[in-house]
A protein has these predicted regions:
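Secreted/periplasmic carbohydrate-active enzymes, especially glycoside hydrolases
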Residues: 1-128, 132-136, 170, 179-180, ...
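Substrate-binding/catalytic cleft of secreted carbohydrate-active enzymes
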Residues: 103-104, 113-207
Length: 207
């Protein structure tokens, strides 16, 4: 579709950015889950030293008060489910074929969205949603600091919440199926008029 090249020297900080223009892109949606590939190559002279392929889609999202969620400029109601990671009786181990089978069943019943309750999603799930056309609300964690269960995330929240949420966003920011980030599930702090809004704002700023 397009190409670009940028040269660097051994004295550079090894961090650089490029901008590409895609004219008349095919937009990603549940009905037309079109994907592109960005192929990054690093050369030393004429020798290829490294190559990395990033799959991505092109789409716009917007939430308009009193009107709803808009995908590619079109109002798009969510017809979704809370999707736990355990794949029913198969257990918690990631099974790509079972994930895709599950998504086909969901699409057949009219679903267009998944909330990854109540954990960060596996890459295999997001890749399947990209390819098969399912919008995703990617959930971060099930607990903040207040106790819900004895061995919950609250024990590591202060140490890991920012790192985990940041990593979640960076890992899936190129995936067109991910249209929302979820900062917590049924957290008790939401009923605290002081702590709840402060923590919510703190986590939203990371997103």
């Amino acid at each position: 579709v397009t190409t670009n090249e940028k040269q660097g020297t051994r004295f550079d900080d090894n961090v650089f950015s490029q901008e590409l223009v895609v004219t008349h892109p095919a937009l990603w949606s549940p009905e037309t889950p079109v994907l592109y590939q960005a192929v990054s190559k690093v050369y030393e002279g004429n020798t290829l030293k490294d190559e990395y392929v990033t799959s991505f889609g092109i789409r716009t999202i917007e939430v308009i008060p009193n009107k709803g969620f808009f995908l590619n400029g079109k109002r798009t109601p969510f017809k979704g489910v809370c999707n736990h990671h355990d794949l029913g009786p198969l257990g918690g181990a990631v099974n790509d074929a079972a994930i895709r089978h599950q998504i086909r069943i969901l699409k057949d019943m009219g679903c267009n969205a998944i909330r990854t309750s109540h954990n960060m999603p596996a890459p295999e799930l997001i890749r399947a949603c990209d390819e098969m056309g399912i919008m995703v609300m990617a959930e971060s964690f099930d607990e903040w600091k207040a106790m819900k269960v004895r061995n919950g995330y609250r024990h590591v929240f202060d140490e890991w919440a920012v790192k985990d949420l940041t990593n979640l966003i960076r890992h899936y920011r190129n995936n067109p199926s991910v249209v929302m980030w979820c900062i917590g599930n049924e957290v008790p702090e939401q009923w605290d008029g002081n702590k709840g809004p402060k923590m919510s704002y703190f986590l939203q700023e990371i997103c």
